[in-house]
């Protein structure tokens, strides 16, 4: 697996959860002898929704909601077989979306 790179993208709504998951991945990769770059924070997406409170009149009465999507990127340079096996067995939190890419 020489001259390869694993890129891991993490997405979550809770920044504490994504930081904890990123730290678990970094610890696992370093324990197996791989070199890690990151976690690199990417820009946070903020989606805002405005909802009318009143069912009939009062156009001024509105509620605003927001959901933030936090993202992180990790690069694992020169992974070993142990690194790949350990990452496959790693159990991360349920609220974190993980995308793994081999380059």
Curated annotation (Swiss-Prot):
Superkingdom as given in the UniProt entry: Bacteria
Pfam families named among the record's database cross-references: Ribosomal_S10
Keyword DNA-binding in annotation: no
Database matches in SMART domains: Ribosomal_S10
One GO term (biological process): translation
Subunit structure: Part of the 30S ribosomal subunit.
Name listed for the protein in its UniProt record: Small ribosomal subunit protein uS10
């Amino acid at each position: 697996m020489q001259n390869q790179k694993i890129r891991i993208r993490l997405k979550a709504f809770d920044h504490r959860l994504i930081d904890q998951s990123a730290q678990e991945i970094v610890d696992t990769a370093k324990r197996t002898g791989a070199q890690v770059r990151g976690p690199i924070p990417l820009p946070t997406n903020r989606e805002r929704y405005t909802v009318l409170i009143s069912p009939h009149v009062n156009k001024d009465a509105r509620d605003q909601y927001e959901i933030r999507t936090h993202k992180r990127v990790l690069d694992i340079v020169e992974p070993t077989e142990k690194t790949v096996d350990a990452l496959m067995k790693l159990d991360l939190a349920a609220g974190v979306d993980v995308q793994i890419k081999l380059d």
